[in-house]
Swiss-Prot record:
Biological process terms in GO annotation: phosphatidylethanolamine biosynthetic process
Upper lineage: Bacteria, Pseudomonadati, Pseudomonadota, Alphaproteobacteria, Rhodobacterales
Protein encoded by which gene: psd
Location of the active site: S190
Cofactor: pyruvate
Entry protein name: Phosphatidylserine decarboxylase proenzyme
Subunit structure of this chain's protein: Heterodimer of a large membrane-associated beta subunit and a small pyruvoyl-containing alpha subunit.
Length: 232
């Protein structure tokens, strides 16, 4: 019982967070030496840092054709948009679904569908609020093109935010990916854009809470029309 309770709160941590947690812990020790109340503030910040870099196990649906959310967060935009030019996917608009991550969300990014990475392109840029429309065009970003088994392509774009200053991408051209497989993360608040193939409708709604690697975002085999929703 106690172990189950602990596992609810204690999750694995992404290796990217090790140095940050160590720095916070050292600063906390110094703060305790200066003044105990400051030390307890440091403890709180250290716990938050660990929580930010958590990397929990996710149960990913494995049926062929399902596209899952690449990030934890909230669906902030659903609109037609041309994928990043640096991916070379052409000028035709695709349906773009944006998932905004705040500083309390898990920031590990996962592949929305299995396939082979055909392009990885980093572009420096601004650090506007990631929830804004123009963040897709103006902010620092790292874009991936993934070719599916049937030859179609999707794009996944990691976008830095107002606080984020570090995009981590752990794959390169030619890397095979499984649906829900980890491929990177963004530190301290950001956004993920997914560009769906032509004719594929999103099965999520604006404002919907997403769980990376688990929430079904779209289905390549479904004739269902785009979903609508209401807050209740």
């Amino acid at each position: 019982m106690a172990i189950d309770l602990l596992s609810t709160f204690i999750k694995p941590m992404h290796r990217e967070g090790t140095k940050f947690v160590a720095i916070f812990a050292v600063v906390t020790l110094v703060l305790f030496l200066i003044w105990e109340p400051l030390g307890w503030i440091g403890v709180g910040l250290t716990v938050w840092c660990y929580y930010f870099f958590r990397d929990p196990v996710r149960v990913t649906p494995t049926r062929e054709g399902l596209i899952v959310s690449p990030a934890d967060g909230v669906v902030s935009l659903i609109e037609p948009a041309v994928p990043p030019a640096e991916l070379g996917m052409g000028p035709a608009p695709m349906t773009r679904v944006s998932v905004f991550m705040n500083v309390f969300d898990c920031h590990v990014n996962r592949a929305p569908i299995g396939g082979t990475v055909t392009a990885v392109a980093y572009r420096p840029g601004k650090f506007l609020n990631a929830s804004l429309d123009k963040a897709s065009e103006d902010n620092e970003r790292n874009a991936l093109a993934i070719r599916l088994a049937d030859g179609r392509q999707i794009a996944v774009v990691q976008i830095a935010g107002l606080v984020a200053r570090r995009i981590l991408c752990e794959v390169r051209e030619g890397t095979p990916l499984l649906t829900g497989e980890r491929f990177g993360m963004i530190r301290f608040g950001s956004r993920l854009d997914v560009y769906l193939p032509e004719g594929v409708q999103p099965l999520v709604c604006l404002g919907q809470v997403m769980t990376s690697g688990e929430t079904v975002l779209a289905d390549l085999t479904s004739p269902e029309a785009r979903r609508t929703g209401a807050a209740r």
